[in-house]
Amino acid sequence: MTTHSRPERVGQEIQAAIGQLLTRGELRDPRIGFITITGVKVSPDLRVAQVFYSMMGTAQERAETQKGLDAAKGFVRREVTAAVNLRVSPEVFFTFDESVGEGDKIDRLLREVKQKEGW
């Protein structure tokens, strides 16, 4: 059985709560397109939650999405605090997750090598 620290467990709960907000369409800002919450890192004192997201699109679309998410931070903070039942309301920061794009790039390169080598 794996043991998780409290910040990790709270991060998982925050990720699920924000996912529900997105699924239910409660973030109505048109700048926020189809995004996926890839992870949440919570500070040890539970006062800060860094939310990582990924999306397809151009750099301009990512910038607009970031603006929309930044504008929705207060709403997300209130909803997360209520859903996760926390005494402290964590400050929420949204960060684009570059690792998804890097993973796609690595997959593409591996496929190219496979084709060239005839695997």
Curated annotation (Swiss-Prot):
Task: Give Gene Ontology CC terms.
Answer: cytosol
* Compartment(s): Cytoplasm
Alphabetically list the UniProt keywords.
Cytoplasm, Ribosome biogenesis
Q: Does the keyword NAD apply?
A: no
The protein's superkingdom reads Bacteria
Record GO biological process: maturation of SSU-rRNA
Major subcellular site? cytoplasm
Disulphide bonds annotated for this chain are none
Single GO term (MF): ribosomal small subunit binding
Family, similarity comment: Belongs to the RbfA family.
PANTHER family (alphabetical)? RIBOSOME-BINDING FACTOR A, CHLOROPLASTIC-RELATED (PTHR33515:SF1)
Subunit comment:
Monomer. Binds 30S ribosomal subunits, but not 50S ribosomal subunits or 70S ribosomes.
Q: So what does this one do?
A: One of several proteins that assist in the late maturation steps of the functional core of the 30S ribosomal subunit. Associates with free 30S ribosomal subunits (but not with 30S subunits that are part of 70S ribosomes or polysomes). Required for efficient processing of 16S rRNA. May interact with the 5'-terminal helix region of 16S rRNA.
Name by which UniProt lists this protein: Ribosome-binding factor A
- Organism of origin: Stigmatella aurantiaca
